[in-house]
Design a protein with these regions (language model features):
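N-terminal basic, low-complexity leaders that serve as flexible interaction/assembly modules and, when applicable
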Residues: 1-88, 221, 297, 326-340
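Glycine-rich, aromatic-flanked loop segments that form ligand/cofactor-binding clefts
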Residues: 5, 9-25, 66-96, 116-160
Length: 340
């Protein structure tokens, strides 16, 4: 087992100081990222270029000394193995070739031979692991079945997921089957990335908060538990990120995982109380990093004052904003180290 501060904290073991990394830490707020992104030509081309994807994964670790790297990719990439086609326009979120809103369309979402995206991401993972310092952990990630299903049904990013919820209520059995297919596909994908060298996995249920606790329990928890359960055999820490999910924390306590990443809508003590035996990751509001460095330091110290003494990973409650000043990220990281 790698002697990593991050991995120890995931397992609830004592550490000399809290580990720190940032969701979307490889990205547009970094000038060095923008140079490589221009070289690749597009976001998707960058994701599909193992050498360049590895380079942008390493950039924030070099600059800030983060305790973990997260592979540069996107949650939609492994869907190509199911015959799903999409593109990323320069503005706005991803666009699927077609929205898949009916059981007949969901039945076509099935494993295809020759999907190359998973292999490209695995190659990037292997390159990063070979280049990373021994003590820095490498995280691989995927989308949770509910969040991926929302992209499939809506055909794009949605603010309220109305069509997806209507489809779930109208065709519960077929929708549950779609979620089961997504769970199995994501489990196989992450197993491959662990074989390639990932030290931990994070499952992003970004749209978890759009469901009531009852619907989340009935529809989202079974496939999510299947996915996490499959990953138990890898032996690596499993982290669940659930966005906007304060009302779901008691429900999430049933999901097999080592750590839960929470957003700023819930307090760290509140999350720890509702998720006994789990490490907690988070939860600074990314908006705080758009203020002055002094404000960043104050907000970070406030978060640290509330954090559990053991089993806490310092992070944001959501991905970092592209317009974030680099100096503010440095202030965030330095404060974690100084206070500790």
């Amino acid at each position: 087992v790698r002697a990593s501060r991050f991995l120890a904290a995931c397992r609830g073991e004592p550490v000399d100081r809290p580990p720190v990394w940032v969701m979307r830490q490889a990205g547009r707020y970094l000038p060095e990222y923008l140079r490589v992104r221009a070289q690749a030509g597009s976001f998707l081309a960058l994701c599909r270029h193992p050498e360049l994807a590895a380079e942008v994964t390493l950039q924030p670790v070099r600059r800030f000394g983060f305790d973990a790297a997260i592979i540069f990719s996107d949650i939609l990439l492994p869907l190509t193995a199911l015959g799903v086609e999409f593109e990323f326009p320069d503005e706005g979120g991803p666009q699927l070739r077609e929205a898949l809103a009916t059981p007949r369309q969901w039945a076509r979402v099935a494993p295809r031979a020759g999907g190359t995206d998973a292999a490209l991401v695995a190659e990037a993972v292997a390159r990063v692991r070979a280049a990373l310092p021994e003590e820095v952990a490498l995280i691989a990630f995927c989308g949770a079945p509910w969040t991926l299903a929302s992209y499939l049904v809506e055909g794009a990013t949605s603010r309220d997921h109305t069509r997806t919820k209507a489809a779930l209520l109208e065709y519960p059995q077929a929708f549950a089957q779609l979620l089961a297919t997504l769970a199995e596909t994501m489990a196989a994908y992450l197993e491959g990335l662990v074989r390639a060298g990932a030290d931990a996995v994070q499952v992003f249920d970004s749209w978890a908060g759009s469901l009531s606790a009852q619907l989340y329990q009935e529809f989202a928890i079974p496939p999510l538990s299947t996915l996490m359960g499959r990953l138990a055999a890898t032996g690596v820490p499993r982290i669940l990120y659930a966005g906007g999910a304060s009302h779901l924390l008691p429900t999430l306590a049933a999901v097999p995982c080592e750590a839960v990443s929470v957003d700023w809508r819930v307090s760290l003590p509140g999350a720890a109380a509702l998720l006994p035996g789990r490490a907690i990751q988070g939860n600074l509001d990314p908006a705080a990093l758009l203020a002055s460095p002094a404000t960043v330091r104050r907000a970070t110290r406030q978060m640290m004052a509330e954090a559990p003494a053991r089993g806490w990973i310092a992070n944001l409650g959501h991905g970092i904003r592209p317009e974030t000043p680099v100096a503010n990220v440095a202030a965030f990281v330095e404060t974690i180290r100084e206070v500790a």
